[in-house]
């Protein structure tokens, strides 16, 4: 039975993570994978070329070596492994799953700060540091989403946790209390 894309990503990312960890090159492999992810997203033809069964393996190896010379040996070995087992079509899913494992291991969280107006980098950084400290994360990487309907304040979404400090929600709570106390 053929494996689904998610199963392939899960298995291969776990194998890469364990391999990089054993070789004490987890951070280097993580950097390499993020470079690859960026390149793959900007050049989708690259994955099509490396996944194409018509193109000979030695041509694919030449192509790979043309841009992988700065990667760690563990990353190069992993790319060769993907080439050997014809799994390049799953590369982006594998990298995303690897990044999730890496973030969990390093206690790094990602989330969204929803605000009525765009937050500058300093504001986003202060919110990120305060939340990370309060909830025990080593680091919190926040992206800002603007939603004028919240009127003011902030809604933080990190993992399955939502902290709603918006004026809209506070006004709704006050309204409900007033109706309740009639």
From Swiss-Prot:
GO terms for cellular component: plasma membrane; proton-transporting ATP synthase complex. PROSITE patterns: ATPASE_DELTA. Keywords: ATP synthesis, Cell membrane, CF(1), Hydrogen ion transport, Ion transport, Membrane, Transport. It is found in: Cell membrane. Its main location: membrane. The keyword Cell membrane applies. SUPFAM superfamilies: N-terminal domain of the delta subunit of the F1F0-ATP synthase, V-type ATPase subunit E-like. InterPro entries: ATP_synth_OSCP/delta_N_sf, ATPase_OSCP/d_CS, ATPase_OSCP/dsu. GO terms for molecular function: proton-transporting ATP synthase activity, rotational mechanism. The keyword Transport applies. It comes from the Bacteria. It is a peripheral membrane protein. F-type ATPases have 2 components, F(1) - the catalytic core - and F(0) - the membrane proton channel. F(1) has five subunits: alpha(3), beta(3), gamma(1), delta(1), epsilon(1). F(0) has three main subunits: a(1), b(2) and c(10-14). The alpha and beta chains form an alternating ring which encloses part of the gamma chain. F(1) is attached to F(0) by a central stalk formed by the gamma and epsilon chains, while a peripheral stalk is formed by the delta and b chains. Belongs to the ATPase delta chain family. F(1)F(0) ATP synthase produces ATP from ADP in the presence of a proton or sodium gradient. F-type ATPases consist of two structural domains, F(1) containing the extramembraneous catalytic core and F(0) containing the membrane proton channel, linked together by a central stalk and a peripheral stalk. During catalysis, ATP synthesis in the catalytic domain of F(1) is coupled via a rotary mechanism of the central stalk subunits to proton translocation. HAMAP family: ATP_synth_delta_bact (MF_01416). PANTHER family: ATP SYNTHASE DELTA CHAIN. This is ATP synthase subunit delta. The gene is atpH.
């Amino acid at each position: 039975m053929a494996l689904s894309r998610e199963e392939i990503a899960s298995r291969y990312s776990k194998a890469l993570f364990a391999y990089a960890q054993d070789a004490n090159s987890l951070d280097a492999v993580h950097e390499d994978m993020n470079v690859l992810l960026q390149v793959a997203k900007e050049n989708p033809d690259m994955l099509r070329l490396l996944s194409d069964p018509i193109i000979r393996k030695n041509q694919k190896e030449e192509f790979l070596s043309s841009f992988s010379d700065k990667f760690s040996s563990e990353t190069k070995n992993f790319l060769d492994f993907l080439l050997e087992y014809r799994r390049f079509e799953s590369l982006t899913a594998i990298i995303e799953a690897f990044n999730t494992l890496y973030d969990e291991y390093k206690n790094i969280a990602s989330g969204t700060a929803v605000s009525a107006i765009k937050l500058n980098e300093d504001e986003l950084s202060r919110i990120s540091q305060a939340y990370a400290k309060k909830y025990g994360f080593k680091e919190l990487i926040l992206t800002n989403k603007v939603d004028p309907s919240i009127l003011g304040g902030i809604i933080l979404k990190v993992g399955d946790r939502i902290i709603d400090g918006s004026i809209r929600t506070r006004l709704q709570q006050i309204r409900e209390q007033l109706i309740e106390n009639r």
